[in-house]
């Protein structure tokens, strides 16, 4: 799946729908400087390499859910593991699923 590029006169953003909308490049066009760490050219765009991106979507929750379980409304809720390299459920599901772009313009997707 190709990378998605968005830009305006000041900023350039490159997103990988394949890696859960991970940001592979985000830079200031006028200063020609990276704002986020760019995705390494030596790495392949895969689910397991999203950690190398400058940012990935942590939705619908952020951080670690210890032993994949939390307590809510007087009951325990068990979640499935979100990433094969992680021992606990972590960062929601948005970053480990392919995203489908429904609409794109030069500056939005």
Language-model segments: what does each one mean?
Residues 1-109:
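Surface-exposed acidic/polar loop and edge beta-strand patches at domain peripheries
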């Amino acid at each position: 799946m190709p990378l998605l590029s968005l830009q305006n006169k000041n900023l350039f953003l490159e997103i990988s729908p394949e890696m859960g909308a991970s940001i592979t490049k985000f830079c200031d066009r006028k200063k020609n400087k990276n704002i986020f760490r760019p995705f390494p050219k030596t790495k392949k765009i895969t689910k397991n390499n999203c950690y190398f991106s400058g940012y990935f979507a942590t939705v619908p929750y952020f951080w670690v859910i210890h032993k994949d379980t939390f307590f809510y409304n007087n009951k325990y809720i068990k979640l499935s593991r979100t990433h094969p390299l992680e021992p606990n459920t972590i960062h929601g599901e948005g970053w480990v699923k392919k995203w489908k772009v429904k609409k794109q313009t030069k500056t939005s997707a």
